[in-house]
């Protein structure tokens, strides 16, 4: 492995069917940059609706992008403590939207939140449960406020609870999207987080399972209608460079990837695939091959700079001596 500037180049022999060059940036990247890019990318209504339909409705086009409405992602609930002082609970979701679902001639509303994780969160079920509970609590408080304002008739029980018998809550669903390259080894439900007890005790505790999207486990990429599916598929192969090369060079969908998706891939998995600056789409297959060739040339320049002879490089890189000598002359001219 060679380190050239901030670029890592992994190589075996450089010719034939043997390991080809992989041209990477700092793989760790900035967690803040990844979080910002993930939020920006998934906030798009088309991709948001696509994710919901693929994950929640088996690909059926239930949620339409045009029927999504951005909601305040701050979950706030104020309650009175034992000393009659108000206590405020506040959490910040990544994304929250109201969706309209049409079914059998009826129209329903639901709230869908998306939490994106670039690292495993070992308390995710409780975190999601708190988000959802705060939202339901806020809905109840809003219903009580509305009833007080209207001053309509109510029973003693309805007055005490603030929530009337006919009142109903808007369903809240949270999708957790894991964008890390490592396997998710965290809990997937509340029961996964509980200490081991008697099965009879477990049966008494309601479970809370999260809707978890893990690219490495997805086998339903055909459900996606936007390039979000391709982005998740690249993330799935991000730790297997041969698989990624095969995906990018053999799947025709990657010949016309929108630049936003390519930029998301670059940030989320730490690669540096050049964007097409002359248009809105990038041929990732060509960009991959161009980048591989540039990495090949960069490695040869580095070997020349370190004192390797053209003959040694020719044998290592499986290149003709003429090709290496041409790069040698180019390198010499640049040095001068």
What are these regions (language model features)?
Residues 1-336:
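Elongated, amphipathic alpha-helical interaction scaffolds
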């Amino acid at each position: 492995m060679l380190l050239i500037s901030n670029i890592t180049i992994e190589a075996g022999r450089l010719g034939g069917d043997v390991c080809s060059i992989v041209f990477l940036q700092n793989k760790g990247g900035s967690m803040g940059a990844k979080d910002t890019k993930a939020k920006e990318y998934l906030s798009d209504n088309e991709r948001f609706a696509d994710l919901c339909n693929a994950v929640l409705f088996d690909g059926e086009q239930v949620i339409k992008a045009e029927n999504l409405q951005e909601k305040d992602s701050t979950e706030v609930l104020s309650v009175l403590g034992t000393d009659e002082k108000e206590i405020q609970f506040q959490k910040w979701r990544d994304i929250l939207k109201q969706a309209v679902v049409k079914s059998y001639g009826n129209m329903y509303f639901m709230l869908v939140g998306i939490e994106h994780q670039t690292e495993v969160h070992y308390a995710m079920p409780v975190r999601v449960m708190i988000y959802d509970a705060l939202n339901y609590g806020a809905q109840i408080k809003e219903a009580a406020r509305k009833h007080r304002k209207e001053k309509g008739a109510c029973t003693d029980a309805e007055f005490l609870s603030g929530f009337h018998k006919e009142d109903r809550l808007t369903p809240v669903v949270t999708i957790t999207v894991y964008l890390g390259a490592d396997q998710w080894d965290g809990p997937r439900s509340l029961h996964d987080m509980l200490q081991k007890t008697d099965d009879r005790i477990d049966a008494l505790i309601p479970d809370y399972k999260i809707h978890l999207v893990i690219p490495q486990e997805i086998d339903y990429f055909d459900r996606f209608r936007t390039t979000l599916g391709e982005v998740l598929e690249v993330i799935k192969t991000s730790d297997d460079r041969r698989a990624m090369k095969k995906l990018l060079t053999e799947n025709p969908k990657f010949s016309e990837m929108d630049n936003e998706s390519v930029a998301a891939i670059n940030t989320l998995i730490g690669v540096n695939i050049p964007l097409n600056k002359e248009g809105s789409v990038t041929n990732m297959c060509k960009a991959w091959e161009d980048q591989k060739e540039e990495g090949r040339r960069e490695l040869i320049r580095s070997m020349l700079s370190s004192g390797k002879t053209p003959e040694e490089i020719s044998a290592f890189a499986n290149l003709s001596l003429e090709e290496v000598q041409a790069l040698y002359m180019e390198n010499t001219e640049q040095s001068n």
